[in-house]
Amino acid sequence: MKRYSFQDTVMVVNGVEITGWADGDDVIDIERRNDSITDKMGADGGMMISVGTDKSGSVKVKLMQTSPSNAFLTGIMSLQEASGSLFVPVFVKFQDTYRQDLAIGTQGYLKKPAKLTRGAQGNTQEWEIVVERLDLAFGLV
């Protein structure tokens, strides 16, 4: 029998663990932005493939509005939006410590501040980090 628990997952941004996750089955969404390999079919039915060099990726996280990680990510966003040479690149590491799934994103940026929604109930804040290079390795268990 195989098992999974979100308690075995760790997400770190610039060395700080992200906490205060929202509910749902998609609170962490990590993917490459483009296909690694594309193909073209010739008029004679032969196929040619092209192996791309674009390894950029997207890392989306959904947090509760009460998550302390919102303040941390807002601080990075503020530094990135400031003029001058204060730009802070974002580095991301995700790991499932049980299965050993691993995603490492380097030289990234926060795409925009999280949307601010408030009402009678608590809400979710979603952040997207775009990285220049995203390396993925899937489970050993």
Residue ranges of model-derived segments:
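Polar/acidic, low-complexity leader/linker segments enriched in S/T/G and N/D
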Residues: 1-31, 137-141
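A generic structural signal for short beta-strands and their flanking turns/coil linkers
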Residues: 7, 26-28, 37, 44-45, ...
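Detector for glycine-centered tight turns/loop "hinges" at secondary-structure junctions
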Residues: 15, 45-46, 99-100
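Generic secondary-structure microfeatures
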Residues: 22, 32-36, 55, 63-67, ...
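Short beta-strand and beta-hairpin "edge-sheet" elements
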Residues: 30-32, 91-140
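Short secondary-structure capping micro-motifs at structural edges
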Residues: 43-50, 74-80
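Oligomerization/assembly interface segments of phage tail-like spikes and tubes
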Residues: 48-71, 121-136
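Mid-chain, well-packed structural core segment of small domains
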Residues: 68-105
